[in-house]
Amino acid sequence: NLLMAISNKTGKLVLTTGNKSEMAVGYATLYGDMAGGFAVIKDVPKTLVYDLARYRNEQSRVIPERVITRAPSAELAPDQEDTDSLPPYEILDPILEDFIERDLSPAEISAKGFDPEVVARVTRMVVRNEYKRRQAPPGVRISRRAFGRDRRYPITSGFN
């Protein structure tokens, strides 16, 4: 990995790019975008990442507008968008917050008005991707329940 070679040569850390929403549902690639020494935004939901980017640009434009306005994509296939297999982040993030931060069950989350099938799929994704989160580098904690520290789930137990 070129970035890791540069890191070793210069004594600097490689920063990863995964946010809490992506880490929650497994939209992070082991030894790809998860490879690094520090995960700056691993506890920041995707919607807040966009809010922070817009706020930063209000001070002075340093983030290209196309980065903020283009549809989110894992970029693993041509014309792929995250919403091909996920709900929009404006829906996903509140579901994740209820499940991860508030320990609400899928039934309790659905009772708040979310589609029960979407909630079930999202919560399954969270549980199934614990193994990836265990391999993530450390990062800043901004929430009540950060992955790897405050919320750990058994990997091999088969709990639902």
What positions do the PLM features span?
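ATP/NTP-dependent adenylation/nucleotidyl-transfer catalytic domains that generate, transfer
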Residues: N1-N160
